[in-house]
Design a protein with these regions (language model features):
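Generic long, charged, amphipathic alpha-helical segments
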Residues: 391-444
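Conserved, charged catalytic cores of large soluble enzymes
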Residues: 271-294, 395-418, 479
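Conserved alpha/beta core surface patches that mediate binding of polyanionic ligands
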Residues: 85-109, 192-264, 318, 328-349, ...
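Metal-assisted phosphate- and nucleotidyl-transfer catalytic regions
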Residues: 268-335, 339, 512-514
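Positively charged, low-complexity, intrinsically disordered RNA-binding extensions
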Residues: 1-47
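Auxiliary tRNA-acceptor-end handling modules of aminoacyl-tRNA synthetases
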Residues: 31, 44-221, 225-226, 231, ...
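C-terminal structured "cap/appendage" subdomains that terminate the fold
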Residues: 423-481, 485-488
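Conserved short loop/turn motifs at secondary-structure junctions
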Residues: 125-132, 158-163, 279-288, 310-314, ...
């Protein structure tokens, strides 16, 4: 062995600079390449024939309320700049985040929501004011769905990856899952929608045609391992709250009836959020041609042109889908409300009903989120206000969502107790700025927080029982009594849920969250 080693050394020296060092009998070395099986860069490589992937081919159109279907490239977008931006993003844009959207700065400045370094990317911490807004939105959409006849349920957040029906579904979305190990080596995935639990519940139900339509609703905490480069602020998250409703329908006719009802509820939600969005409708070609008049009627309800995507054949589980989308401050779009007609999953999950003839049949299934993700709704509100601010306007919250609806500013400490008594008479989320700051500074701070009603309180207000509020909305009442102020507040709050302020009433008692 030594002779062979020397010969190798001599041969190598002809072309290379070689050094040979003594190595004792009791020494050894080992080369190894180690990687944790769960490490992001680890791979299991299998030799198998590459499967041919079917390319999804679609065509883009603009459909007007008058029923004209025009190729998107030939449509005159004059007066519809928002629709143009949305089309260009959908057809040619990238979801990768290149510039930080404006809502991120606002959500931090207003102490609403923030990143959590102790968790995975896209899992957020919600501060009291942000959580208040989030819960109010959840309560409102819950009310809308229950009033529409939905039955509220709760289903597990994790499911067996080897479940016969679920495993096929998972293969379509392999990268989106969080996996969890449990007892006896069983593996589960965290749900990325409420679909799984509601499918399995529907499968075990005994359903007659007389029971249909059946609407199942859940305010679902869901998890999706979105690509890191696409996760940004509260627009696209890995953990989010999605109000999910599934409607089991007897046939296509009933599915279209329910679709229209839920479409109109979605339009109502856009008005509630006070957002000017853009609608996308997506169809399989045959389905669109069969129901074109029905679709045009939906567009008329919206009142302006919509973007239409048409596939020659069905690539997905749905034959018709609609979304309300919003363009953000950096030229990206994101979806809020959505309704879909599903013709595949009832069969995949063996969801059946007994028809009038006594036979088991597969129903049509509607997927709907009347609001879209709640986190995204907060994002939409902030993005809308950011664009207003950029155009020189004042930012504001819808009155029912403002963390502080009325702020009392005593001119000195001697009026703090009077303000505390006054606060008991005002029917709103109210706080008192008792800090050692000037009145002008307190007014500026209240305006920075978008407080919709600001009242400075001193000797004159105490003696006369009247106030001159600063409004962040149009109001002709320049001087009001407590009674009149409550009338104004009641009118602004009509039809909306209310929660008490989640912070100490005195600003001097509040901690800073960032």
């Amino acid at each position: 062995a030594m002779e062979m080693l020397k010969n190798i050394e001599e041969e190598l020296k002809k072309e290379y600079n070689v050094k040979r060092a003594p190595f004792g009998w009791y020494k050894a070395f080992k080369l190894s390449c180690k990687g944790h099986p769960l490490a992001e860069l680890s791979r299991q490589i299998e030799c198998k024939k590459e499967e041919e992937k079917e390319e999804v081919v679609s065509n883009w159109y603009i459909l007007t309320p008058e029923g004209e279907l025009i190729e998107a490239e030939k449509f005159d977008f004059k007066g519809y700049e928002g629709l143009k931006k949305f089309y260009e993003y959908e057809a040619f844009g990238s979801r990768k985040v290149e510039k930080e959207p404006a809502h991120i700065k606002l959500m931090k400045e207003h102490e609403l929501v923030d990143y959590e370094s102790g968790s995975d990317y896209g899992n957020m911490r919600w501060y009291p004011k942000g959580y208040l807004i989030k819960r109010l939105l959840e309560e409102k959409v819950e009310e809308i769905c229950l009033n529409a006849g939905a039955m509220e349920v709760e289903t597990p957040i994790m499911y067996d990856v080897n479940h016969p029906a679920l495993s096929k579904y998972l293969k379509k979305f392999p990268a989106r899952q969080y996996r969890v190990k449990a007892d006896k080596g069983k593996e589960f995935f965290l749900r990325f929608a409420a679909c799984f639990g509601q499918y399995l519940m529907a499968k075990d139900m005994t359903i007659s045609y007389k029971n249909l339509p059946i609407r199942l609703f859940e305010l679902a905490k869901s998890f999706r391992r979105e690509q890191h480069g696409e996760v940004t602020g509260i627009k696209r998250l890995r953990a989010f709250t999605m109000p999910d409703m599934h409607t089991i329908c007897r046939d296509e006719k009933q599915a279209l009836e329910e679709f229209k009802k839920q479409y109109l509820l979605s339009l109502e939600w856009a008005k509630i959020l006070e957002i000017d969005g853009e609608i996308a409708m997506r169809f399989v070609k045959d389905f669109f041609e069969k129901h074109r008049d029905y679709v045009v009627d939906l567009v008329k309800k919206w009142g302006k042109p919509v973007l239409v995507e048409i596939w020659d054949k069905r690539y997905f589980y749905f034959v018709m889908k609609f979304e309300i989308n919003m363009n953000d401050s950096v030229g990206k779009a994101f979806a809020l409300s959505t309704v879909q007609i599903d013709v595949e999953n009832p069969k995949s999950f063996d969801i059946t009903y007994i028809d009038e003839d006594g036979k088991e049949k597969y129903p049509y299934l509607l997927h709907a989120s009347i609001s879209g993700g709640i986190d995204r709704c907060v994002c939409a509100l902030l993005e809308k206000e950011a664009m207003k601010i950029k155009n020189g306007q004042k930012g504001s919250y819808p009155f029912w969502l403002a963390p502080t609806q009325v702020r009392l500013i005593p001119v000195s400490h001697e009026f703090v107790n009077d303000c505390l008594e006054l606060a008991k008479k005002i029917k709103a989320r109210i706080d008192i700025d008792d800090r050692d700051e000037s009145v002008s500074r307190k007014i500026r701070d209240a305006e920075r927080e978008w407080v919709p009603i600001i009242i400075v309180y001193g000797e004159k207000e105490k003696n006369e029982g009247k106030f001159k509020p600063r409004y962040r909305f149009e109001c002709s009442d320049k001087e009001v009594t407590v009674e009149k102020l409550n009338e104004i507040i009641e009118e602004k709050m009509q039809g909306f849920p209310f929660r008490k302020i989640p912070l100490p009433i005195l600003l001097s008692k509040r901690p800073k969250f960032r």
